[in-house]
Amino acid sequence: NAIRKRLSAVKGGRFAQWCAPAHVEAVVLSDILGDPLDMIASGPAAPDHTTCVQAVEIAKKYSLQLSETAWELLNRETPKQLTNVSTQIIGSVRELCLAAAQAARELGYEPVMLTDHLDCQAKEAGRFLGNIVRTHAADGKKLAFIAGGETVVRVVGNGLGGRNQELALSASECISGIANACVLSIGSDGTDGPTDAAGGYVDGDTVRELAENNLTVSGVLARNDAYHALKAVNGLIITGPTGTNVNDVAIALVG
């Protein structure tokens, strides 16, 4: 971002700078956890917190082959203060989680907001949600545990999948055999990894259904092949592109 902002005429607060003294009303759709205005779309209407020194150091560290003009631009500072901008965030992962909570209420579930800053390994998040389900399966309540954010996957195999599919599949062992529970995880943009799926869905029967297809959760995860495994048990969620992106949401239902 530090480099990108300096090679652009509008990023890093320069759009708002060009507009001055006119007032800018920035309406922001955030796809970054924590909603840092200077990073969302590289902050065209936000003061830039990076410096020329950082940009040059990054370029040198990675031995970037840049033109003389580009090097000159890296040494031009971006706006650090903007007095002509008002900003309103109209969509974010927090709003996504709140919408999921409202939908859960309408379906008769009591929503439990776990976090809107989920940023761990997908497998860890899946097991975490699955264990929460197992803990509350006998409570006699209809609960919806909601977590928003964006997990990561450590790719070691040559399979096909995405972080949301891997999260869901990782939860399946924890909820195996529980009749009144499920876990789903989806990307708000309708895509998950290099696949046509938005995410995945598992329930108490998923592990058994995988076994009937000669598949195990551990084996599938070792190959990073959640897509084909979930496809075999009708666990893919396919929405098509939604035209927006406010990160991911994972939901565990019990009761």
Model-assigned labels for residue ranges:
Residues 122-132, 153-167, 193-201:
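Short glycine/threonine-rich loop-to-helix capping motif typified by GTGT followed
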Residues 48-63, 157-183:
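Gly/Ser/Thr-rich active-site loops/lids in small-molecule metabolic enzymes
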Residues 1-63, 235:
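A glycine/threonine-rich phosphate-anchoring loop and its flanking beta-alpha core
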Residues 8-9, 16-22, 31-33, 38-40, ...:
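Solvent-exposed alpha-helices and their adjacent loops that cap or buttress functional pockets
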Residues 169-255:
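Internal helix-turn-beta structural module
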Residues 47-128, 132, 137:
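Accessory alpha-helical/coil subdomains and C-terminal extensions
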Residues 2-7, 32, 151-153, 187-192, ...:
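Acidic, glycine-rich active-site loops and adjacent beta-strand->loop/helix elements
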